Amino acid sequence: MAAAARGSGRAPTRRLLVLLLLQLLWAPAGVRAGPEEDLSHRNQEPPAPAQQLQPQPAAVQGLEPARAEKGLTPVAPVHTNKEDAAAQTNLGFIHAFVAAISVIIVSELGDKTFFIAAIMAMRYNRLTVLAGAMLALALMTCLSVLFGYATTVIPRVYTYYVSTALFAIFGIRMLREGLKMSPDEGQEELEEVQAELKKKDEEFQRTKLLNGPDVETGTSTAIPQKKWLHFISPIFVQALTLTFLAEWGDRSQLTTIVLAAREDPYGVAVGGTVGHCLCTGLAVIGGRMIAQKISVRTVTIIGGIVFLAFAFSALFISPESGF
């Protein structure tokens, strides 16, 4: 009985020892797991805020899914100065184009070249007159732009403010001329051009008579003419020379030179040519009717206001802005 009692008392003791050993084995692992988990949480950095991606071209968007599959971060678009420079160049061209076409229109409507084209179109072929006048005006515009562009060797700040002062002087002068001008000024200009063209026609007819055969002797006393006159219409040459000489030193030529010195030269050349084409085309198509309807006094006053507006705009635009 005593042996059985000792055997039964050892069994619970063994069980307690086994439980204590198991507890000692498991306890360090549990204690170590806690700090490691804490340290892992501490080492984790906070998630970076999501970047708002700008819409990109199709070629770039096609590359983004491939980069995402590889686990790479999408590349943000890089903006260069080329786009800004191109936008500024386009804006400068548009500004120069609008300035040139508006100034040419208010300067040429009712001008001497306008009446020359109008009167010659009533007497001769309109296309021939338009071609001769436009060739002269295009050549004059290109020469004026070259003269103005040659001044770019001077620092822009000087040419900018000098051209602004010239615009102000032209504007004040045109306003003064317009206010002092009589309502019949356009008619007087028209009559002056008619007299000049009549004189040219008489000289041309006299030349033709001298080139004709002599009735008494039956021989020709022709005056030698230049060979190129046989291939080019005399009307074309007359329209070209009259328009070129009338435009040389005119207010529109000086204005084109001033604009080319401060604006984009290509915009000034294109805008000036388009402006001349509109005015000359209007004169050729309308003829005398438009010449009599146009009030030179009103056009001159409007032109003075436009010139002063360009001069006033220089107070708000920096010379370094590029337009």
From Swiss-Prot:
One of its GO terms (cellular component) is lysosomal membrane. Residues 35-44 have a biased composition (Basic and acidic residues). The keyword Lipid metabolism does not apply. Residues 184-211 form a coiled coil. Keywords: Antiport, Coiled coil, Golgi apparatus, Membrane, Signal, Transmembrane, Transmembrane helix, Transport. InterPro entries: GDT1-like (IPR001727), GDT1-like_CS (IPR049555). Residues 50-59 have a biased composition (Low complexity). Residues 111-126, 173-227, 288-298 are cytoplasmic. Residues 35-60 are annotated as: Disordered. It is found in: Golgi apparatus membrane. Residues 34-89, 148-151, 249-266, 320-323 are lumenal. The chain crosses the membrane at residues 90-110, 127-147, 152-172, 228-248, 267-287, 299-319. GO terms for biological process: calcium ion transport; Golgi calcium ion transport; intracellular calcium ion homeostasis; manganese ion transport; protein N-linked glycosylation; regulation of lysosomal lumen pH. It catalyses: Ca(2+)(in) + n H(+)(out) = Ca(2+)(out) + n H(+)(in); Mn(2+)(in) + n H(+)(out) = Mn(2+)(out) + n H(+)(in). Expressed in mammary epithelial cells (at protein level). It is a multi-pass membrane protein. The keyword Coiled coil applies. Belongs to the GDT1 family. This is Putative divalent cation/proton antiporter TMEM165. It comes from Mus musculus. The lineage of its organism: Eukaryota, Metazoa, Chordata, Craniata, Vertebrata. The gene is Tmem165.
